[in-house]
Design a protein with these regions (language model features):
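Zn-dependent metallo-beta-lactamase
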Residues: 1-19, 26-29, 96, 103, ...
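Active-site environment of divalent metal-dependent phosphoester hydrolases
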Residues: 28-29, 51-56, 76-79, 93-96, ...
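Active-site-proximal loop/helix segments of hydrolase catalytic cores
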Residues: 114-123, 128-179
């Protein structure tokens, strides 16, 4: 599996014959200006919630690539009114897609569209096929609900967790979250995009190391194989 960091909470993940893109915030992000949106070619676009820094490029990527959007009911309805094809999930629900299974799980955050309208409750995704399982937490606080993931899903090979604090949990809480989800390999997201979420990267790595976990911090545009 190849994972490319698109900046902020955005990732391009290649699973066998399908490409998934999560929370694309590329074109408005000056830190991601070296990424050409036309070269991001998803089969599926997965959106954890409706905030602009998570859905900014969802409409264009979906239409340009005839990609299916997957998110909560309200996000899919909002995008559907713009001509985007989608499939709605809600909390605790899972669905088989061409790439494997997607389960929409709880997150503690807020969610509204850029125009201020209600975007439903935010969530995260657990994704798996017959070879690998991973969790993209979206924007969330540390929550005991995370302990349900090992009880209801296959064992995680890695997880993508927000670590930037202020708007989500910080790296100290994210390291505890790694314990809750029983996952030794964490990819950090939602950090250093804006001033309020600027963190000390070495301290973040140390917080995970102290709990026997690995924190992977990718540069925007960089990839990793798992």
């Amino acid at each position: 599996m190849k994972i490319r960091f698109l900046g902020h909470s955005g990732f391009e993940i290649k699973m066998k014959n399908h490409t998934l893109v999560f929370d694309p915030y590329i074109s408005p992000n000056e830190l991601a200006s070296h990424i050409n949106l036309s070269e991001v070619q998803p089969d599926f676009v997965l959106l954890t919630h409706g905030h602009g820094d998570h859905i900014a490029d969802a409409e264009q990527l979906s239409k340009d690539n005839d990609a299916l959007c997957i998110s909560n009911y309200e996000v899919i309805n909002w995008l559907g009114a713009k001509g985007v094809k989608g499939h709605p999930l809600n909390h605790g629900g899972k669905k088989e897609f061409a790439f494997g299974t997607a389960k929409y799980v709880n997150a503690i955050h807020t969610s509204s569209f850029p125009d201020g309208t209600y975007a439903g409750n935010p969530g995260g995704f657990v994704i798996w096929d017959d070879e690998i399982c991973f969790y993209h937490a979206g924007d969330t606080a540390l929550t005991l609900d995370m302990k349900l993931i090992p009880l209801t899903c296959p064992k995680l090979d890695f997880a993508i967790l927000p670590i930037g604090d202020n708007f989500t949990m910080g790296y100290e809480d994210a390291a505890i979250a790694a314990d809750y989800i029983d996952c030794p390999k964490i990819i950090g997201c939602h950090f250093n995009t804006f001033a309020p979420i600027t963190i000390d990267l070495e301290k973040a790595k140390e917080a995970f190391k102290n709990r026997g976990k690995e924190l992977i911090l990718l540069e925007i545009g960089d990839s990793i194989e798992i």
